[in-house]
Amino acid sequence: MKVAGADEAGRGPVIGPLVIVAAVVEEDKIRSLTKLGVKDSKQLTPAQREKLFDEIVKVLDDYSVVIVSPQDIDGRKGSMNELEVENFVKALNSLKVKPEVIYIDSADVKAERFAENIRSRLAYEAKVVAEHKADAKYEIVSAASILAKVIRDREIEKLKAEYGDFGSGYPSDPRTKKWLEEWYSKHGNFPPIVRRTWDTAKKIEEKFKRAQLTLDNFLKRFRN
């Protein structure tokens, strides 16, 4: 029986893409993933994940990757959950080897609803199980999670080579916030790697626009 797992990396950052990976393997090869030490990707360092990447790919029958750009995230018509459903389905439908059972790390507080939303849009018949923290429960989801994180880390390194070191890209990172403020101060806008609909970006934009408005009003009074 073919078993698939799907997970994402990069839902929360204000900078960079969202990466979704679907991975499929013959059920009796899951023990090979266990032997590799595949587990919840959050428990592994970036170096450990990078080291596991090629080993995981060798075990898998197939995997697919969907990269969702900041522009697509900002331009979404519905919620982030709906965007994830759409792109999880895209990744699962892209698999050349179709699974009979699919395990997914649920982005929805109602895991069963998340599973049904995906199952109903698949181009093939499969049982879909969505659970919270599935990446810590099922090796095939852990494998998908590791691949997604490594692919996103590689994308982030490319962006840093072009735009400079913006830290982790998460709103809670002071380096990221400092980089965003400095970039906006210098250019009067954000580059395409930034999710402009995120509160962090919106607040910085509003702050600079208020400052500019105050300056404009001051200069207007001075000229009068």
Curated annotation (Swiss-Prot):
Residues 1-210 form the RNase H type-2 domain. Its EC number is 3.1.26.4. The keyword Hydrolase applies. PROSITE patterns: RNASE_H_2 (PS51975). One of its GO terms (cellular component) is cytoplasm. Its cofactor is Mn(2+); Mg(2+). GO terms for molecular function: manganese ion binding; RNA binding; RNA-DNA hybrid ribonuclease activity. It is an enzyme of class 3 (hydrolase). HAMAP family: RNase_HII_A (MF_00052_A). This is Ribonuclease HII. It comes from Pyrococcus abyssi (strain GE5 / Orsay). The gene is rnhB.
